[in-house]
Amino acid sequence: MMNISDALNVIKAHQAKIPVQVIDLANELGLKVYEVPNWPDDLSGMVRKNVEATGGFDIFVNQTHAETRRRFTIAHEIAHVVLHPHLIGDGITDDALLRSGLSNDVEAQANRLAADILMPREALNSRLKMGINSVYVLATEFKVSDQAMAIRLGVAQ
């Protein structure tokens, strides 16, 4: 895995086109993404060390979740690799209720970077300046859930 500065530069390059192609981003960061068809609904995703690739990581995401949810989960797992590779060990499993066994701070950091990846401030601000401020319209363009966009805009209820 590359250092955090290089990883953030790769992320920034992928943010030039909205919606961010999150699987392409993961691949460029050296991560493989697998969709798992038979996970329980409360299990969103996980990241673990790739036992075949020294220093590599694999991301697994629940195939039955909506595309917007899968995209956020992939971005969240990318964030763990970028921010917390030393904590991953044999894997971080994120479920709908517990998120993972990690601290709330670590999970909050991963959620913030995931939001930054999928809804970059610069792109969002340019649309807001053009008068595009509908949560639904922005969520559709950025391919995120209405809830994720509302949180990003600070208008979540």
Regions found by a protein language model. Give the residues of each.
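Active-site hotspot residues in diverse enzymes, especially metal/ion-binding acidic/histidine motifs
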Residues: M1-Q157
